[in-house]
Swiss-Prot record:
Phosphotyrosine modified-residue sites: 15
Tissue specificity: Expressed in roots, stems, flowers and siliques.
Subcellular locations according to the entry: Cytoplasm; Nucleus
Name of this chain's protein: Cyclin-dependent kinase A-1
Domain Protein kinase stretches: 4-287
Effect the entry attributes to changing residue 15 to F: Abolishes phosphorylation by WEE1. Increased kinase activity
Species for this entry: Arabidopsis thaliana
Amino acid sequence: MDQYEKVEKIGEGTYGVVYKARDKVTNETIALKKIRLEQEDEGVPSTAIREISLLKEMQHSNIVKLQDVVHSEKRLYLVFEYLDLDLKKHMDSTPDFSKDLHMIKTYLYQILRGIAYCHSHRVLHRDLKPQNLLIDRRTNSLKLADFGLARAFGIPVRTFTHEVVTLWYRAPEILLGSHHYSTPVDIWSVGCIFAEMISQKPLFPGDSEIDQLFKIFRIMGTPYEDTWRGVTSLPDYKSAFPKWKPTDLETFVPNLDPDGVDLLSKMLLMDPTKRINARAALEHEYFKDLGGMP
């Protein structure tokens, strides 16, 4: 750890404290994540180290670069490139955020590019939310943070400071207890983030797992076998769920054009096997005026 000097604590993430730090060798500013593991006394599981080492290979302009992994005194430190703004802070501090439809489109495109890259490397995120989408103010580029960490460390119910980990962006198949979920879980999260950028408020702000499910059902309709094959066999599905009819998504994103509504509805299909994938989403008509961003 001698190579890095902590400058200040900048936050408390899902897995531990995040510091702004300086690389003493290159003088570069970096973000240092100290991973707090459940079994402190046992040190770092070798599976976690293997998973994390694979992430160092991931290189893409829309992914926050994992520069180094330091295993020191039973602690794991992850060294990332430093970005000081996330999408949540940006939305909260920009009253007219939802009016800049072109910027929202470029952000969504970049999110999908990062996800398509990760999915092509068989890496899921599982915990996408505005807080882990980082923005480089100089270039207005957006980068996904914390990709692959859920597989290495699991997703806790609460952070180490006892904050509840948000459920607002969690896909229905996870909430219903599926153990065989895959890349569509990230697309669901992106749909929720897209809707939030457009309306500047969360689409499904649940405060418990059942409340989260019911908030989804009230808008998207309660799923049943005809609309989602196999749903009634999922561990947490109950035949006693209230039967809500689907509503019109447009009413929640009134300033989104028809192409945008079409893309959003394809991302928020309840049945994960029917949900659009990241590559297909990038080819959607909604992005045609971007002229294939670099």
